[in-house]
Regions:
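Short, small/polar-rich motifs associated with maturation and membrane association
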Residues: 1-365, 372-373, 377-385, 449-450, ...
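Active-site phosphate-binding and catalytic loops of NTP-dependent enzymes
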Residues: 167-171, 227, 622-629, 956-958
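Residues on the lipid-exposed face of transmembrane beta-strands in outer-membrane beta-barrel proteins
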Residues: 242, 330-334, 364-370, 450-456, ...
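Transmembrane beta-strand segments that form the barrel wall of outer-membrane beta-barrel proteins
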Residues: 345-351, 591-600, 642
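Conserved C-terminal beta-signal and adjacent last beta-strands/turns
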Residues: 763, 848-876, 928-977, 996-1011
């Protein structure tokens, strides 16, 4: 990903020409120079394959230092007359050249290894491809091969730590609902900051893409690279390209793994006896009598009466799922010069860490390319996917987080199951009883994508391409909540069923005209396009409760008392015109201009259209004549860009008045149907606009032994849609206006090193990115626990600076405090303005909720038939909070963890033991205000992936008729280095620690086979 290099020309490639007839591979004439013709020669033969065992078609096989050579045929075979003392040189674009002495051998089996520097050269950009060495915008890329075999639960998790400037956070480990957040160069707006994602040119979701189908992923980060997508590109663009057929005989491959999951981190709760002792301590601290006697505590400790004095390990009881996962992929790839195909089937299954939780996915993909005539090419991209996500339900909702909340907050002093088999209960219920009852939520997502293109060659260099595509999604769901009966006779309910059906469809039509021309050292490329997209969404819901039996799951079985039905529909359309011009002089001076004009139905007439230009330029200094004698410098390019982008990702119909139905009224003693406007509209709203400057350079040293890339950017987003406060006398909810502004500035640095020492090949690469966010304009300031104000980073923590713990009642009495209840053992806060009191004016910014620094580094090694991969990912300068009950413990009698053993102990108004936590309190809450004690440093470094593989030797594979077989073991989320409390994952969303399904580590064994 981080390595960029120039393709070096083969010493023989300029003498070999291959047509469309495969027979030409065998009929290419060899040129024998005079020296060769004078020597004694012999015939040799062999096969050239890649590291997967597949034949390399068209590889150059030449006698070194001569033009005596040939190219391999469709099966990778060659035959050549050559002197015995000659050296055979084998080369092919994208692979490392090999030199082999002929000696007395007559048969050769040659394996070419990939040159990662060269394979990285061409990257996918908007509506086309570009040589990386000629890029003038900021683009990061990763190949599908770099993701192959990783046991991650989704594609976004696979990308963590691999793309500079891209921050990816997985908020939970729940199967199918990981809650992954992707941010490119920070948060660009107060509204939707998600990037635009396209799969094979159509806007779509990456959740339904089979990772093994991916050829490459490109991330367009700056305005120059992304502006060709205009309306939705303000937060960056992710382009996913799937694999296409290649010329050659059919190649059948299988890739699969089986794995097991476990929680990365989970809370360690106090035993019942410990809880009772510390609970008593908290009661005494508040001046109340102890709740547990010494006899009670001893019974909890010895376990003699488990029905009345239990020690229930709620989290262990909850995490009883198998955690088993397996993934299987079969693909067929091949074709002729006229027709190529790529077909794949995939199945993925993930069982949860808790019972009745799972994620199952099926994928089918067919990509086809056909050269109908010399001037007409036709192709299709089609895929079908089906995902079924199952989760247990509880009496409150279908939120799986409620199970973890209960398992974390119910003290071990409450019984789970009595000796007679009935269930005990806490005031909120029993999460184990909920699971065993068998209520569940099922969501079945069906996703069909189909597109077809036809490309006409009009004249040399001029083509016209038409594309038609449809993206159809169908989400069919049911939530079944069961009534629970407990051992004490109490009932928790009611039982209920909710059905929903959500359908949405996008139709895309595009026409693209491409032209390229080379005139001497001048190279020109131009593109003009038009696009139309229409989107429609329909949602239907129905709900009933109080079923006569828990086993009834159809709506008709429920009561009509309290039933509800609802439905909604949405239509949206986008029209676009776009173009691009590229100019390249002698590979040294590079220019690019993009322009896109978009019209969106989300805005009123007169405000729908926006125009988004961008400019970029590059200078390859290393190609100048005055640089030719600097042999340690292979490549040096400086580049810069400026562009304007748009964002219309906001709620629909905001320019239209909102009318609420069902507002009935009495008219002449008769209740009449009524409707009323509830929210003011603003017909003047328009695009959020982003202007971005990017300056950078790319350099390669010592035959690309070391590669460096650097970017500085300044991104300013204006006209952000925000609610402007209105007087209460206005009478309606305030409308949105283009009233906000935000700036992101940052740098990105990437380093790469590739080398070979003997039989050891290795590739080390890494990056570091820094982003600083600042709100420039915001009409509705909020100074709560998370600040939303001009001059500060968006959503930063805002509270008191904690300076320690009061050591005595006297110290607390003589110090500025924020509560009359503050005593020895409580938190001490800084009086920022020195006015002798602690109040809201003493609050300060405590830290960012979004990391300012992201980084990652990767190591790939090969030794003979062994390979090794390690991938690390980290963030810094970021802060998180956890759930209040989990943070403090004992809140209103809730549970506590072993961390709370390290508390401050107070006797007779003085601290006798200073701990990390202040003194334990049960009901008093003055320590729980937002402060630097609560907003904790969540920086971390995580070993995301570790993989060791072994390729079976070719001698063995021949006997079992395989081209390639590779065995590997792999792990994900294996180690985390952080100062964040070890009960919680630092990646989890703030405030949800304790409410969230934990992140998972995955250990897997896999197999790759090529037939």
């Amino acid at each position: 990903m981080l390595i960029a290099t120039l393709l070096s020309a083969s010493p023989f490639s300029s003498h070999v020409y291959a047509g469309t007839d495969h027979g030409l591979f065998n009929s290419v004439a060899t040129e024998l120079n005079n020296d060769v013709s004078q020597q004694k020669t012999k015939k040799i033969s062999g096969t050239v394959v890649d590291e997967t065992g597949l034949p390399v078609i068209g590889a150059n096989v030449v006698q070194k230092g001569t033009t005596n050579g040939i190219i391999t045929d469709i099966d990778g075979r060659f035959s050549l007359d050559i002197p015995e003392d000659a050296v055979l040189e084998i080369s092919y674009i994208g692979y490392l050249t090999q030199s082999i002495p002929v000696g007395n051998k007559s048969s050769f089996q040659i394996t070419l290894r990939e040159d990662t520097q060269k394979l990285d050269e061409v990257v996918v950009v908007g509506f086309g491809t570009q040589k990386k060495v000629n890029l003038t915008g900021a683009v990061s890329a990763v190949s599908g091969e770099q993701l192959s075999g990783l046991p991650a639960t989704n594609i976004a998790n696979m990308l963590q730590g691999k793309l500079p400037g891209v921050s990816i956070t997985a908020e939970t480990g729940q199967p199918g609902r990981e809650g992954t957040s992707i941010r490119i160069r920070g948060v660009g707006t107060m509204n939707n900051s998600d990037p635009m994602i396209l799969v094979d040119g159509l806007e779509s979701s990456m959740n339904d893409v089979n990772p093994n189908d991916i050829e490459n992923i490109s991330v367009l980060k700056d305005a120059a690279a992304a502006s060709i997508y205009g309306t939705r590109a303000a937060n960056g663009v992710i382009l996913i390209t799937t694999k296409r057929g290649k010329v050659g005989k059919p190649i059948l491959t299988y890739n699969g793994y089986v794995g097991w999951q476990k929680a990365v981190r989970k809370p360690h709760h106090l035993s019942s006896a410990q809880y009772a002792e510390l609970y008593n301590e908290g009661r005494i601290n508040e001046g109340a009598a102890p709740a547990y006697t010494a006899e009670d505590i001893e019974k909890y400790r010895n376990g003699s009466d488990p029905d009345n004095y239990p020690n229930t390990k709620w989290m262990d009881l909850l995490l009883q799922g198998s955690g088993f996962t397996h993934n299987h992929n079969i693909s067929l790839n091949g074709g002729t010069e006229d027709t190529r195909y790529a077909v794949s089937l995939a199945y993925y299954n993930q069982d949860g860490l808790i019972k009745n939780a799972s994620h199952e996915r099926y994928n089918v993909r067919v990509n086809l390319d056909s050269k109908v005539t010399k001037w007409l090419t036709f192709g299709i991209n089609s895929s079908l996917s089906r995902r079924e996500i199952i989760a247990p339900t509880n009496p409150f909702s279908n939120d799986i987080g409620q199970f973890f909340r209960q398992a974390n907050r119910i003290p071990n002093t409450f019984v789970n199951q009595y000796s007679d088999g009935t269930y005990g209960r806490h005031i909120d219920g029993n999460p184990i009883a909920w699971i065993e009852a068998g209520g569940k939520s099922t969501s079945v997502y069906s996703h069909a994508v189909g597109s077809a293109f036809a490309e006409v060659k009009i004249i040399d260099g001029l083509t016209l391409k038409g594309i038609a595509g449809i993206d159809y999604n169908f989400d069919d769901g049911k939530t079944h909540i069961k009534e629970i009966t407990y051992g004490d006779g109490s009932v928790q309910g009611p039982n209920s069923v909710e059905d929903y059906l959500d359908r949405w469809m996008t139709v895309t039509l595009q026409g693209i005209l491409n032209y390229q021309k080379q005139i001497g050292k001048h190279s020109f490329k131009g593109m003009l396009g038009v696009s139309r997209e229409s989107y429609r969404k329909n949602l239907t819901k129905a709900y009933r409760k109080n079923f006569p039996s828990n086993e009834l799951t159809e709506l008709d079985g429920g009561s009509t008392n309290g039933w509800s039905n609802s439905g909604s529909a949405l239509d949206a359309n986008i029209g676009s015109y776009f173009g691009r011009i590229n100019y390249d002089y002698a590979g040294k001076y590079l220019l690019e201009f993009n322009l896109r004009s978009d019209g969106s139905s989300k805005f009123a007439k007169g405000h729908r259209w926006g125009t988004f230009p961008s400019f970029s330029a590059g200078w390859r200094i290393s190609e100048e004549s005055f640089m030719k004698n600097i042999d340690w410098l292979d490549n040096l390019k400086i580049r810069g860009s400026w562009g304007k982008l748009g964002n219309h990702r906001t709620d629909d119909y905001q320019y239209i008045a909102m009318i609420a139905l069902g507002q009935n009224y009495n008219f002449n003693n008769v209740v009449a149907d009524g409707a009323v406007q509830t929210k003011a509209n603003n017909s003047n709203i328009t695009w959020e606009t982003t202007k971005e400057l990017d300056l950078g350079f790319d350099a390669g040293f010592k035959n690309n032994l070391v590669n460096v890339s650097f970017d500085y950017y300044d991104r300013y987003t204006d006209n952000i849609l925000a609610v402007v406060p209105v007087s209460l006398l206005f009478g309606l909810d305030a409308p949105v206006s283009n009233a906000g502004a935000m700036r992101n500035r940052g740098i990105e640095v990437s380093l790469g090193h590739v080398h070979k020492i003997g039989n050891v090949e290795y590739d080390v690469n890494g990056y570091m990115a820094y982003n600083k966010n600042k709100v420039e304009k915001y009409p509705n300031p909020d100074k709560g626990d998370k600040i939303k104000m001009e001059g500060y980073a968006w959503d930063s923590f805002y509270g008191y600076e904690c300076t320690g713990i009061f050591m005595s009642d006297e110290e607390a009495k003589n110090s500025p405090v924020h509560s009359a209840y503050v005593k020895a053992g409580d938190l001490k806060f800084k009086d920022q303005n020195n006015d002798g009191k602690i109040d809201a004016e003493d609050r300060v910014v405590l830290g960012n909720t979004i990391p300012n620094i992201t980084y990652g580094f990767n190591l790939n090694m090969k030794y003979r038939d062994f390979d090794f991969l390690a991938s690390f990912q980290g963030v810094a300068d970021v802060y998180r909070t956890v759930d209040t009950e989990m943070m403090w413990g004992f809140v209103n009698g809730q549970n506590a963890t072993e961390r709370h053993l390290d508390r401050t102990i107070v006797e007779n108004g003085r601290v006798t033991q200073l701990g990390h936590f202040p003194r334990i309190l049960i009901n008093q809450s003055h320590n729980r205000v937002m402060s630097s004690f609560l907003a904790m440093n969540a920086s971390y470094l995580r070993l995301k992936n570790l993989q060791i593989g072994y390729n079976l030797p070719q001698s063995l594979l021949k006997s079992i008729h395989l081209n390639r077989a590779r065995l590997y073991v792999s792990g994900q989320n294996l180690f985390t280095f952080t100062k964040f409390p070890n009960d919680f994952d630092p990646e989890v969303k703030s405030g949800s620690g304790g409410y969230s399904y934990p992140q998972v580590a995955i250990y897997s064994i896999g197999l790759d086979i090529t037939f």
